[in-house]
Design a protein with these regions (language model features):
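Central hydrophobic cores of alpha-helical transmembrane segments in multi-pass inner-membrane proteins
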Residues: 2-6, 52-74, 123-126
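N-terminal signal-anchor module of multipass membrane proteins
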Residues: 2-57, 330-331
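Hydrophobic core of alpha-helical transmembrane segments in multi-pass integral membrane proteins
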Residues: 23-40, 87-101, 154-166, 193-210, ...
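C-terminal ends of transmembrane helices
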Residues: 65-76, 127-133, 204-214, 325, ...
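Membrane-interface helix-boundary motifs at transmembrane edges
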Residues: 73-84, 135-146, 208-218, 269-275
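Membrane-interface helix-loop-helix junctions at boundaries between adjacent transmembrane segments
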Residues: 77, 99-189
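Predominantly late transmembrane helices and immediately cytosolic-facing juxtamembrane segments
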Residues: 128-132, 249-266
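Extracellular/periplasmic helix-loop-helix junctions in multi-pass membrane proteins
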Residues: 237-243, 297-316
Length: 351
């Protein structure tokens, strides 16, 4: 008899159905589409995507930014537990945005750089949070070392973007004269190359080690989430407007899927005559879509009517919405002593 533990791959306990969870939350659909566009030689599909990309961004990404705000104000106890987030942060955001538009070369430039630097960090944090959720749902015990290594694996793609992308990240916080030094350029390029490999290798190694130990603490869907994020931030380069837009569509789908699940599962358990789950889901998405349209398509024109330039109004409104979303998102996903934990530990299926 072999003394090696039996291999047991845990697919992860889905929130809805394995196909739904793997394709939308796990990022599997994004990998299929990206692979098809990259290797499938489908010019018609590529042309359709380019033609309708900004409609997809509205339906997915704009709605997902609004979704964190809708979730904040519909989550029970938000005004009581998060008074600054619900009442003070919106006013502070408008004030900072107005000053940034009035001073685009100063505060506006830094707001834009903050948004571009924070965005891949937010992606990494979302990947880590989702991976941990499925780990909790698998029921396997997790040590602090396990969480630490999973966090490192999740944030390696962010570090790659931080060092690799121009105009933000390290180029925002370090003087250009320092970065142009030959030694600095060599260290930077070497770190970028190393992080590119580690972003894909580290999650796979953690997963394989867990299988070897026979405990299968990292579900397969958690590995898929981490690798999808590595493809988005590292594999696609995160450099051209087209690739960034494609990535934001799938990131938005991922976020909207899990956000809607949490909202609906809380609502259908409401004691006072809950409506069917599909009505709750459609109503929530409709609110996210409507608010997203107002924020991204209408709000910039308010500053144009006040006499500010169109370009800086659009760009800085987008930056302010992103930063507001990043802050809100950090608070609405708490698991301990929160209704979110009941959703994470619940059985699959919405209704």
């Amino acid at each position: 008899m072999s003394s090696h533990p039996r291999l047991r791959v845990d697919p992860g306990r889905p929130f809805i159905h394995p196909a739904f969870d793997y394709l939308l939350i796990g990022g599997g659909l994004s990998l299929l589409v990206i692979g098809w566009l990259t290797f499938g030689r489908a010019p018609a599909v590529r042309q359709w995507l380019q033609t309708n990309l900004w409609t997809l961004v509205l339906l997915s990404n704009s709605a997902h930014f609004a979704g964190s705000t809708v979730r904040l104000y519909t989550k029970p106890g938000s005004f009581r537990d998060l008074p600054f987030l619900t009442m003070g942060l919106p006013l502070a955001s408008v004030a900072v945005l107005t000053l940034a538009i009035a001073w685009p070369g100063g505060l506006g430039r830094h707001l834009q750089s903050l948004y571009l630097t924070w965005s891949p960090y937010h992606y990494a944090a979302q990947a880590y949070g989702l991976a941990v959720m499925y780990c909790y749902r698998s029921g396997s015990p997790w040590t602090e070392d396990d969480k630490r290594w999973l966090r490192i694996a999740s944030f390696l793609p962010f570090l790659h973007v931080f060092l690799a992308v121009g105009g933000a990240g390290i180029e925002w916080v370090m003087p250009a004269a320092v970065l142009r030094q030959p030694a600095a350029e060599a260290v930077r390029s070497g770190a970028v190359a190393g992080l590119r490999v580690l972003s894909f290798l580290t999650p796979a190694v953690i997963f394989l080690l867990h299988q070897r130990e026979g405990r299968s603490r990292l579900p397969l869907i958690s590995l898929l989430i981490l690798l999808s994020n590595s493809v988005w931030l590292v594999g696609l380069g995160y450099t051209t407007p087209l690739t960034i837009a494609v990535v934001t569509v799938f990131h938005g789908l991922q976020y909207l899927a899990i956000l809607t699940i949490f909202h609906v599962k809380e609502r259908v358990r409401a004691p006072a005559g809950p409506r069917p789950w599909w009505i709750q889901a459609l109503g929530f998405y409709a609110a996210c879509l409507a608010l997203g349209y107002v924020l991204f398509q209408v709000w910039p024109y308010a500053y144009v009517l006040l006499g500010f330039g169109f370009a800086e109004s659009v760009l800085l409104v987008i930056a302010a919405i992103n930063v507001h979303h990043f802050v809100v998102d950090a608070f609405i996903w708490r698991l301990r002593r929160d209704s979110n934990y009941a959703v994470v530990s619940a059985q699959p299926a919405v209704g």
